[in-house]
Regions:
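Acidic Gly/Asp/Thr-rich repetitive segments characteristic of extracellular carbohydrate-active
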Residues: 19-62
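Right-handed parallel beta-helix
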Residues: 132-140, 154-167, 188, 194-211, ...
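Acidic glycine-/aspartate-rich tracts in secreted/extracellular proteins
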Residues: 45, 66-69, 141, 329
Length: 410
């Protein structure tokens, strides 16, 4: 028996998304699973087997305890050295591609090829695909550590999970990324790749203790990519009541400026989420009609912050009734970033500066006053799939009390 999200006292895996709750409205996941297709897992090998079983058949997977991703087929821990190709070592890589001698040419050659093979070795263990008609629910304090769940199917629900520290042992140096080059890594905690009808609800996303401060070539040796990315023609997604925190690149909706797979898709609802100590991409959008409402943004300091709303190519962000708490040193115009987009709807925003009282802020006007070219206000659509729109003044209390795992089942 499938029941709507508002229902209480029912088996968590049978809960479905309500008929008006964002772009993924009506998503059922594995709610129709037969009893034989309901499994509880506590190891990576068990999770992989449960997700791969009976492709397309409705299934419910309950996660108990902490599942480690960096393990072998028998769930024994593996280190970065265990994944490394025999021809790869970090000291040799640093010596080969030092910008002082290598310059601005894209990295290539045997050492880069060995790094790529090393990365593929790790990916074979830490990336698990989630197919169609699947519900994955955490029990208690369930955690996925060092794992990437990659949703590639239709009709998927992921709830009550802690996604932590999906890290890349083998970042790549890109001398052309920015003025000084950058280290780039693979692996998001949760990846939606060509996925449709997906509900991501009451989860926690972060880096755990792996905050990383090592630098090479004067740039942070970045072992993390995104927390939650929605890319490659994914569509009809609702992201609700999650905590996303202590991370740089947070939520990317659309990964390329090319329209090949994304035009007319990437329709996403982002509501009642808490973004705390986030550097950027909350979210950054290309192409999609994205409804961003009733979210709580906490920016504790300026040094690690870049922006919150990224206005990308052909994006159509409709932001309303969001609440920001920011430091006094952060200009209001910095909350929005231009990424080749042209329009932004932003109404009902409240901003509290420091410990001050919140006040209404016109995000679009603040951005336009500080930047050229101006963004226009007409995004060409109005959201209708909204079960409840809270006034921004109520957002801090509601989201603080309700977002994240352990609060999903009332």
């Amino acid at each position: 028996m499938a029941v709507p999200a508002a229902a209480h006292g029912v088996e968590p895996g049978r809960v479905v998304l309500g008929a008006r709750d964002g772009w993924a409205a009506g998503t059922t996941g594995g709610a129709a699973a037969a009893p034989r297709d309901v499994r509880t897992v506590s190891k990576r090998s068990e999770l992989a087997a449960a997700l791969a079983a009976k492709p397309g058949v409705p299934k419910i997977v309950y996660v108990r305890g902490t599942i480690e991703g960096n393990v072998d087929a028998r769930d024994r821990p593996k280190s970065c050295d265990d994944f490394a190709d025999p021809a790869y070592s970090l000291p040799a890589y640093l010596a080969q591609y030092d910008p002082a001698t290598w310059g601005k040419t894209p990295v290539s050659g045997p050492l880069e090829e060995a790094r790529a093979r090393s990365q593929a070795n790790q990916a074979a263990q830490v990336v698990l695909d989630v197919g169609p008609n699947t519900t994955v629910v955490g029990l208690g304090g369930a955690k996925l550590h060092g794992l990437t769940l990659r949703v590639t199917g239709d009709n998927v629900i992921l709830r009550n999970l802690r996604f932590e520290d999906a890290h890349d042992c083998f970042p790549q140096w890109d001398p052309l990324d920015g003025a000084d080059g950058n280290w780039n890594s693979e692996y998001d905690n949760l990846d939606l790749v060509g996925a449709t009808h997906v509900w991501v609800d009451h989860n926690d996303f972060g880096d755990g203790d792996n905050t990383g401060s090592v630098e090479y070539f004067g740039r942070k040796y970045e072992v993390h990519d995104g927390l939650l990315d929605i890319v490659t023609g994914s569509d009809l997604v609702t992201v609700s009541w999650n905590r996303l925190h202590d991370h740089d690149k947070t939520m990317l909706i659309g990964s390329t400026d090319r329209p090949d797979a994304d035009a007319g898709k990437l329709r996403v609802t982002v509501h009642h989420n808490e973004f705390t100590n986030i550097g950027q991409r909350a979210p950054r959008v290309r192409y999609g009609q994205v409804h961003v409402y009733n979210n709580l943004y906490r920016v504790p300091e300026v040094a690690s912050y870049t922006y919150s709303l990224g206005v990308g190519v052909e994006s159509r962000i409709y932001a309303e009734e969001n609440f920001f708490r920011i430091p006094a040193a952060l200009p209001l115009g910095a909350l929005v970033e231009y990424w080749k987009g042209t329009v932004l709807h932003a109404t009902g925003t409240l901003v509290a500066v420091g410990h001050g009282r919140p006040r209404p802020v016109d995000l679009l006007a603040e951005y336009n006053a500080a930047n050229d070219p101006d963004l226009g206000p007409d995004v060409g659509w109005t959201p209708t799939l909204v079960p409840r729109l809270d006034p921004a003044r109520e957002v801090p209390a509601r989201v603080t009390a309700g977002a994240g795992p352990g609060r999903a089942f009332g």
